[in-house]
Each structure stands twice: as structure tokens, then as C-alpha cells.
Regions:
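Glycine-aromatic micro-motifs
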Residues: 2-159
Length: 159
């Protein structure tokens, strides 16, 4: 029987997976795997973070040099949790992921996986660029259970 790796994977989250946000429960459910909060951090690269679709989904767009250094949280996760995050983010169909350098609040730099959108309508670049995502009453995130099943978020980016 092949042995599973016990090495943890660092993941940077900037949207609904952060503490206090609508999908944070994904990181706290034991059945999804293991996740441990490491600390808060900021991307070294500037990228546009926008809110899009009728469901108010935060998107980190693959457009280097635009936008801001993005604030978020770093977690160490096991392979099972990483696979479940891939399911949540619909990787590689909707979101892609890559390793980027993140600066922790103590100025230590670490390499982390983060999810971002590579193919998107240019219209998203006209939205306000955020430094950090927070779910708000003005732009409330809509859970998958509240969405129209006939409208895929990936088809709704121009909304």
C-alpha cells in the first residue's frame, strides 16, 4: 500500500475561506481534512482582487502589477483538505492555482498556494480593486445552496 505524505501544504486564502467569512467552515470541518492557521499575510505581487457575478464572489485575477498587495490568511493543510479546497474552488476548471510568495506580519516570507482566475472578461478589470475581502451587506456573498442551479458562476463573470 502506498504511503501518504505527512507533509503539510501552505495555502493563502483571501476571500470567503478567511476567518469570519462564509466558507471558513470548510477549513474547520474535520471530515474535509486537517487545517491549521499559520498567520496573516500579504502577497508580494500586486494583483486585482474584485467582487463579481450576481453571487458576489471574490476573484483574484491573474493580471500582474495591477491592483494591490492582497491581505489574507495562511493555513497549513493536509492533502485531503487541499483536495477538498480544489473541489470548492472548482480547480482546474474555474480557478487555477499557483505558488506565490507571501509576507507574514513578522516580515517572514513563505511560499503558498493560492487560487486565482486566469480566464476572465476584461469587464472585471473595471471593478474596484480591493486590498482585502470582507463579506458585506452591500455585496453579500451567496452560498451555493442559494444560487440558481441554471446559472454557473463561471458563466456569470460578466454580470
Amino acid at each position: 500500500m502506498p504511503k501518504l505524505s505527512t507533509e503539510l501544504i501552505k495555502v493563502f486564502v483571501y476571500g470567503t475561506l478567511k476567518r469570519g467569512e462564509p466558507n471558513h467552515h470548510w477549513l474547520t470541518r474535520n471530515e474535509n481534512g486537517f487545517a491549521r492557521f499559520v498567520g496573516e499575510g500579504t502577497t508580494v505581487e500586486r494583483l486585482p482582487l474584485v467582487i463579481g457575478t450576481r453571487y458576489n464572489i471574490p476573484f483574484l485575477l491573474d493580471k500582474r502589477g495591477l491592483g494591490h498587495n492582497i491581505k489574507g490568511e495562511i493555513y497549513e493543510v493536509d492533502e485531503k483538505m487541499f483536495a477538498n479546497l480544489d473541489i470548492l474552488e472548482d480547480y482546474p476548471v474555474y480557478y487555477d492555482r499557483e505558488i506565490q510568495t507571501i509576507t507574514l506580519n513578522n516580515n517572514e516570507q513563505v511560499q503558498c498556494w493560492l487560487y486565482l482566475i486566469r480566464k476572465f472578461p476584461e469587464k472585471l478589470l473595471q471593478k474596484d480593486y480591493l486590498t482585502a475581502y470582507h463579506n458585506t451587506k452591500e455585496q453579500p456573498y451567496r452560498e451555493r445552496s442559494e444560487r440558481d442551479l441554471n446559472i454557473k458562476a463561471s458563466d456569470d463573470m460578466s454580470y
